[in-house]
Amino acid sequence: MAETNQPGKIFIGGLNIKTRQKTLQEIFGRFGPVARVILMRDRETKKSRGFAFLTFRRLADAKNAVKEMNGVILDGKRIKVKQARRPSSLESGSKKRPPSFSRTRGASRILKCGRGGRSRARSGPSCEGNLGGDRYTPNFNVSSSGRHFAVKRNPSSKRDDPPSKRSATSAQTRSNTGLRGREPHRREISRNMPRGEPASSRRDEYPLPRDYGQSSNDRKYESTSRGYCDYGNYHSREESASKVFSDHAGYLGGRDRDFSEYLSGNSYRDTYRSYGRFHEAPSARGGNNRYDDYSNSQDGYGGRGEPYISNRSNIYSSDYERSGRQEVLPPPIDREYFDREGRQERGHSPKDGLYSASRESYSSNTKIWGIPWRSWRKQI
């Protein structure tokens, strides 16, 4: 629609760049008094841009000029004359001028034309007026590549870098998001993987040697009334323990009785220091308690117990009968006999050595510590 505040304003396009403003005023002044003539020029080069705006004082004069001058050749070019209308894309501040496409006039107008670079602005998009009809519509020629430009991109080519940075940042964010999305999957796999047994179960399955402390078998029989364990569960490798028990079996005269209940697992570590005090009186707790002193020592059957693992045939039978005393020290160590007898008993159960040694060594004895054999056995 025509401008409401200036109804007599007309648009003249397709002018030759050599046509002057004074020439336009003389030619169009024949239709009526002219109020104002504006020839659009480039701000840097000061050259004509090929179109102008002319304002008549009366609306009727403007309409006559449009009918008469539209399509007339002026300075070698056919001009286009029509009623000036305000373009919808223009701001309200620029009422008297069509959009300017000069490089220095403003980046916003160049951006609205869809051009992004400063080098492109020098050539400038051609804004030719479409004279077919009663409205002026600029024609913007797009480059042959058919590229679509962003509307609000800064004309400076230096500003083209931030989109690439943002794209790299977004790609990194997507990669990080992908990594975070795969973490629960790894945790799920780790939860489904078979786990090894706890260290405690492996320790219980393979107990330590008895020289170093109480094993799982000792803990197994701690809850019994006397704290004794089954001697038959121990292997023949514990030869020193089997010899000690075979010696004690001699005091009992080889009675066919299971002597596996005499000592707990702790007694294997605490054995030999009170070995010579077996003649002492029984404790107040009962007949079996005379062996309690036997489990209070801290020697174990590592090196300090060797003096007590000697020839069984000479420990009690000959020494007690010959001396008649109640306190006899053990004889010196016979290592050859210990090694030889250990080799003989290897491969047999400790219970076999227990009874064989008792029958061989003390079958002829009738008294122990001055007490008849039968009465002494009843005390146990």
Curated annotation (Swiss-Prot):
Q: Name one GO molecular function term.
A: RNA binding
What domain of life does the UniProt record list for this protein's source? Eukaryota
| Record field: compositional bias (Basic and acidic residues) | 180-190, 333-351
Q: Which tissues does it occur in?
A: Testis-specific.
Q: Which Gene3D superfamilies match?
A: 3.30.70.330
In residue numbers, the region (Disordered) covers: 82-226, 279-358
In what residue span(s) does the RRM domain sit? 8-86
Q: What else is known?
A: The RBMY1 proteins are encoded by repeated regions of the Y chromosome. The exact number of functional copies is unclear and may vary between individuals, and some of them may represent pseudogenes. Overexpression of Rbmy proteins in mice carrying the Y(d1) deletion that removes most of the multi-copy Rbmy gene cluster does not have any effect and fails to reduce the frequency of abnormal sperm. These results raize the question of the role of Rbmy proteins in sperm development.
Purpose:
RNA-binding protein involved in pre-mRNA splicing. Required for sperm development. Acts additively with TRA2B to promote exon 7 inclusion of the survival motor neuron SMN. Binds non-specifically to mRNAs.
**Record protein name field:** RNA-binding motif protein, Y chromosome
Q: Which organism is it from?
A: Mus musculus
